[in-house]
Design a protein with these regions (language model features):
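A glycine/threonine-rich phosphate-anchoring loop and its flanking beta-alpha core
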Residues: 7, 16, 110-203
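Short glycine/serine/threonine-rich phosphate/pyrophosphate-binding segments
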Residues: 103-110, 131-132, 248-249
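Active-site segments that bind and position negatively charged phosphate/pyrophosphate groups
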Residues: 195, 200-309
Length: 357
């Protein structure tokens, strides 16, 4: 059973990767915990609810449903859930279990962070993207019309329980969206994982258990190491934003309705790779290899009809922009990236246009 420790100045917890771990969820509920509120969506609960019901047998639980979709990742649903928790007897001994994909992880984590100034949360991700990224590291939050995750907080979970078996029924589009995040891990820090994704592509796409378990474990290990080194994104953790600056602009420009988050990140990585080559940070050879691997795990939904100028304007509202300067994570080589600012607007626009083709 791979289990990776996340060590931050305030806390330490396990990110467990194990088939069947959801059935053991009750052992991660601390003694003297009051009522447990499982935050999920109707769709997740319909397909995966029985597994968690078994895992939490004997625990005093309430099930709360969030609306699905990135366009519902707003403050209002969080406030509504908080009201329901009060009505159902929540107090400071209560805790939240986040059971769903990345949107649920973010929103349920944010709910736990602000309810009565903070109660514990247990993260149980049910999509590949959430398992390798969103559930680990304590980032929580919701979107504004202006941009993604502009309201939020850091709130580390008690643990992260990742069960690869739950992905067996995940739709292909959702599965591929998660694979793009794993490609990101390979590009930014894990060259061996990048090579594995290339050589074992057919096994990964076919969801062979040994391949799926390997790429999840390697991605979780990497994320745990980075978060342990830099919880608050002061330095190293910024590399995890590779593809996200451009990707968030694409999501906001399309009102969070046209692309899954992983698909937007895949497009954002393409734009960042083009920009990295234009600015001389990465060789043409490595650039081609990165773009080809992303394409092999495609297709990304068409991005036609989106003005490049609109996307460029959105970059200013990215939460990583400091004093009007957009910070870009650009590739240096496979397994290494760098953070740069002050890139000419003309080059940024050219990179966006190249990625839109």
């Amino acid at each position: 059973m791979p289990s990776f420790r996340v060590e931050t100045p305030q806390c330490s917890y396990s990110a467990v990767v194990e088939r069947g771990v959801i059935a053991q969820a009750a052992k991660y509920i601390p003694p003297k915990t009051g009522k447990v509120f499982v935050v999920t969506t109707e769709d997740v609960w319909r397909h995966a609810g029985p597994a968690l019901q078994k895992g939490l047998a004997g625990i005093d639980c309430e099930i709360l449903h969030l609306p699905g979709g990135e366009d519902h990742k707003r403050l209002a649903p969080v406030e509504q859930l908080a009201e329901k928790m009060v009505q159902r007897g929540a107090d400071r001994t209560s805790m939240v279990v986040a059971y769903g994909g990345g949107i649920v992880n973010d929103m349920a984590g944010f709910l736990a962070a602000i309810f009565m100034r903070g109660i514990p949360v247990l993260q149980i991700p049910t999509t590949l993207l959430a398992q390798v990224d969103a559930a680990i590291g304590g980032k929580t939050g919701v979107n504004l019309v202006s941009g993604k995750n502009l309201i939020g907080s850091f709130h580390q979970p008690l643990a992260v329980l990742t069960d690869p078996a739950i992905l067996d029924t995940l739709p292909d589009r959702e599965y591929r969206a998660g694979l793009y995040e794993i490609i990101k891990a390979g590009i930014i820090r894990e060259p061996d994982l990048f090579r594995y994704l290339d050589v074992r592509r057919h096994a990964v796409i076919a969801r062979r258990p040994e391949a799926v378990d390997h790429i999840i474990a390697e991605s979780v290990r990497m994320k745990a190491e980075v978060v342990s080194s830099d919880e608050r994104e002061g330095d190293l953790r910024r590399i995890l934003n590779f593809g996200h600056t451009f990707g968030h602009a694409l999501e906001a420009e399309t009102a969070y309705k046209r692309f899954l988050h992983g698909e937007a990140v895949a497009w954002g990585m393409r734009a960042a790779i083009y920009l990295g080559e234009m600015t001389g940070h990465v060789s043409a050879e490595d650039s081609v290899e990165m773009l080809e691997l992303i394409a092999e795990y495609g297709p990304i939904p068409p991005v036609n009809g989106i003005p490049a100028e609109n996307l460029a304007a959105r970059l200013v509202h990215d939460k990583k922009t400091v004093q009007g300067k957009v910070h870009f994570v650009l590739p240096v080589r496979i397994g290494e990236v760098t953070v740069v600012s002050g890139v000419e607007d003309k080059l940024v626009l050219e990179a966006i246009r190249a990625a839109l083709v």
